[in-house]
Amino acid sequence: MASLYFTYSAMNAGKSTSLLQVAHNYEERQQHVLLMTPALDDRAGKGRIASRLGIGRDAVSFTHRTDLAAVVRARYMQQAIDCVLIDEAQFLSEEQVWQLSSLADTDNIPVMCYGIRTDAFGNAFPGSAVLLAIADKLVEMKTICHCGRKATMSLRVDEQGNAIRMGQQIAIGGNDRYVSCCRKHWKEAMGLR
C-alpha cells in the first residue's frame, strides 16, 4: 500500500529542492510524477515550483477549493501517475489532506507533501496539523538558526529586520520576509519568555 508523507521544516531548509530532486529520481526511472503547488504562492510564477538554488519546474496550480483527489484521478486517466508531490503543503485545507490520504489508501499512489509546521506566530497551519496527525511518515528537514542551533521556527520580519508580532497567518515571502531561528531566539524576537 502507498503512503502519505509529510516533510516539514522551518523556512529555507531546502524543501522545494528536495521535492524537485524526488521528481527527478522518479523520472530518471521512467516513472511519472504530478507536481502540485498552491495558487496563492506565486513567487516563482503561477503553477511553478522553484528552489533558492535556481532550479524549478512547472506544476499544477490549485486553490483551497480544489478537489485534489479528483484532479489526480482525472490526470491518471490520461497517464499513470507513480507519485504526487505537493509543495507548500501548509496551505492545504484539512479536507484536501484527507483527499490526498485517499489517493494513498484507495488508489495506491504515494503522496509526498512538503511544507512548514507553524506560521510566524507559532501556530500550526491547518493543513500541517492534519498532516502531522495522519501522515504515514513524517520527515523533519533541518536548518540552522544564526546561533548555530537547530531552527524550528520562522520569524516574519519587516524591511528593517524587526520581528512582526501580529498579522495575517499567510503572508507570502522568502528570505526578505522570513528568518529561520531556534525557539529561544524566536521567543526573544517575539517578546515572549
From Swiss-Prot:
<feature type="binding site">
    <location>
        <position position="185"/>
    </location>
    <ligand>
        <name>Zn(2+)</name>
    </ligand>
</feature>
<dbReference type="GO" id="GO:0004797">
    <property type="term" value="F:thymidine kinase activity"/>
</dbReference>
<feature type="active site" description="Proton acceptor">
    <location>
        <position position="88"/>
    </location>
</feature>
<dbReference type="InterPro" id="IPR001267">
    <property type="entry name" value="Thymidine_kinase"/>
</dbReference>
<feature type="binding site">
    <location>
        <begin position="87"/>
        <end position="90"/>
    </location>
    <ligand>
        <name>ATP</name>
    </ligand>
</feature>
<feature type="binding site">
    <location>
        <position position="147"/>
    </location>
    <ligand>
        <name>Zn(2+)</name>
    </ligand>
</feature>
<protein>
    <recommendedName>
        <fullName>Thymidine kinase</fullName>
        <ecNumber>2.7.1.21</ecNumber>
    </recommendedName>
</protein>
<feature type="binding site">
    <location>
        <position position="182"/>
    </location>
    <ligand>
        <name>Zn(2+)</name>
    </ligand>
</feature>
<keyword id="KW-0862">Zinc</keyword>
<dbReference type="InterPro" id="IPR027417">
    <property type="entry name" value="P-loop_NTPase"/>
</dbReference>
<dbReference type="GO" id="GO:0046104">
    <property type="term" value="P:thymidine metabolic process"/>
</dbReference>
<keyword id="KW-0237">DNA synthesis</keyword>
<keyword id="KW-0418">Kinase</keyword>
<comment type="subunit">
    <text>Homotetramer.</text>
</comment>
<keyword id="KW-0963">Cytoplasm</keyword>
<dbReference type="GO" id="GO:0071897">
    <property type="term" value="P:DNA biosynthetic process"/>
</dbReference>
<feature type="binding site">
    <location>
        <begin position="9"/>
        <end position="16"/>
    </location>
    <ligand>
        <name>ATP</name>
    </ligand>
</feature>
<dbReference type="InterPro" id="IPR020633">
    <property type="entry name" value="Thymidine_kinase_CS"/>
</dbReference>
<dbReference type="GO" id="GO:0005829">
    <property type="term" value="C:cytosol"/>
</dbReference>
<keyword id="KW-0808">Transferase</keyword>
<feature type="binding site">
    <location>
        <position position="145"/>
    </location>
    <ligand>
        <name>Zn(2+)</name>
    </ligand>
</feature>
<comment type="similarity">
    <text>Belongs to the thymidine kinase family.</text>
</comment>
<keyword id="KW-0067">ATP-binding</keyword>
<dbReference type="Pfam" id="PF00265">
    <property type="entry name" value="TK"/>
</dbReference>
<keyword id="KW-0547">Nucleotide-binding</keyword>
<dbReference type="GO" id="GO:0008270">
    <property type="term" value="F:zinc ion binding"/>
</dbReference>
<dbReference type="GO" id="GO:0005524">
    <property type="term" value="F:ATP binding"/>
</dbReference>
<keyword id="KW-0479">Metal-binding</keyword>
